[in-house]
Amino acid sequence: MRILFAAAECAPMIKVGGMGDVVGSLPPALKKLGHDVRLIIPGYGKLWTLMDIAPEPIFRSNTMGVDFSVFETKHPSNGLPIYLVGHPCFDSERIYGGEDEDWRFTFFASAVSEFAWNSWKPQVLHCHDWHTGMIPVWMHQDPEISTVFTIHNLKYQGPWRWKLDQITWCPWYMHGDHTMASAMLYADRVNAVSPTYSREIRTSEYGEKLEGLLNYISGKLRGILNGVDLDEWNPATDNSLPAKFSVDNISGRAINKRVLQERMGLEVNPDKYLMGMVGRLVDQKGIDLLLQVANRLLSYTDSQVVVLGTGDRYLESSLWQLAIEYPGRFSVFLTYDDALSRLIYGGADAFLMPSRFEPCGISQLLAMRYGAIPIVRKVGGLVDTVEPYNPMNETGSGFCFDRYEPIDFYTSLVRSWEAYRHQKSWKELQLRAMSNKYSWDRSAKEYELMYKDVCGIKEPSPDAAEVEKFSYGQEADPSRKGKKIKL
């Protein structure tokens, strides 16, 4: 199939949130399945120096009364074709924000539609979040192009209808209060980035006032879990780590822990329980819960905490104050540093994600991949990826709590601290967590089924021998015929 991804981000060149990871990693996984996958993103200013871009545009047109050009380049990691929408409104280093944000992305969506109609015509146009929300609206009456719309974060919904009427042409049939709502109405298929989140957003607690619409379109709504690039995020080959390690030999984690303690100004002690946190410092990520329990946690236990990220100024200031009050035990680094984030994943004993809501979450997957045990709230994709630890039967991959309350979070922290004191069981917990492999290959197969469904392509029924071969992972064995498979 011919598949065109339209998005505001694409890792590693342009990345602000999880959407960038998805758009950078899912297309090559789909390519391995035999599809012709290409991407189209805004031609941001810094891309012209980062990438080798053809000097002449491959397409020129006019939309919303504005001329634009489309240039072609290649993804630096996987070589997939990338189309850049060139216009002065994208020339600055800024990706989001600014008074013209609504106009910029509405213009981008319109330019993508013109390109898909008149240049490279896909069978499936896969749109991501509100920035591309007008594409399904404009494509609604084109029977040759099917649209898929992915909800990465329902909280961000785009410009309202009255503003859209002022900046562009809205079809007479368009309904919906804003870009996100309109996209969900007119896309042929809609998906959220985890099964649990796809159910949560149909409730008033997580629906962001769109739960009624989401229940209305539930027949075309599904949840597909994000994955991780297992080659890029591999502790056995990660050159950012002082000591590499694998699930077969995790002794290198002790060296990484020592280096992490030294770099973050903590007491260097291998026996101290070290918890890490990486991400945006905003309310969604549960920073307020950490602030409420930190004093009690550091008074009751001998734990250490490291935090890496930027965000809300008040939260940054509060975390900095804790670092001043607890030198050698609480450390905060108010920036984003990829190498340091990998050191936290590969050196911390546990990883904190007490999220208020979490559409999918990538950090908990990376933490488990690197042997840091996640401590998470049972919400969104965290439910789908972290199995609660059960010390009685030695199962699970992390510590989970239900309510968004300080006491619940604190209880999980103390439980994990106590579990860490039993090193044999803790190491087994680490090995179970590291054995989880949430790859993009598995996610790509689910997206492929959705694409085929929306295009009316039916899967052929395999013969019995193929089914048996798939079930057992080997050539069909007549001696096993009729035996039950343990799932």
Swiss-Prot record:
Keywords recorded for this protein, A-Z: Glycogen biosynthesis, Glycosyltransferase, Transferase
- PANTHER family, alphabetically? ALPHA AMYLASE DOMAIN-CONTAINING PROTEIN, GRANULE-BOUND STARCH SYNTHASE 1, CHLOROPLASTIC/AMYLOPLASTIC
**Pathway where it operates:** Glycan biosynthesis; glycogen biosynthesis
Listed EC numbers: 2.4.1.21
List the GO biological process terms: glycogen biosynthetic process
Signal peptide start-end: none
Q: Which residues does UniProt call coiled coil?
A: none
State the family named in the UniProt similarity comment for this chain. Answer: Belongs to the glycosyltransferase 1 family. Bacterial/plant glycogen synthase subfamily.
Q: Where is this region: Disordered?
A: 468-487
Q: Which InterPro entries did the record assign?
A: Glyco_trans_1, GS/SS, Starch_synth_cat_dom
Whose protein is this, by species?
Prochlorococcus marinus (strain NATL1A)
Question: Know the name of this protein?
Answer: Glycogen synthase
Q: What is this protein's function per UniProt?
A: Synthesizes alpha-1,4-glucan chains using ADP-glucose.
One Pfam family here: Glycos_transf_1
Q: Which reaction does it catalyse?
A: [(1->4)-alpha-D-glucosyl](n) + ADP-alpha-D-glucose = [(1->4)-alpha-D-glucosyl](n+1) + ADP + H(+)
Q: Does the keyword Phosphoprotein apply?
A: no
Tell me the GO molecular function terms. Answer: alpha-1,4-glucan glucosyltransferase (ADP-glucose donor) activity; alpha-1,4-glucan glucosyltransferase (UDP-glucose donor) activity
Q: For ADP-alpha-D-glucose, which residues are the binding ones?
A: K15
Q: Which Gene3D superfamilies match?
A: Glycogen Phosphorylase B
What is its EC class?
A: transferase
Q: Which domain of life is it from?
A: Bacteria
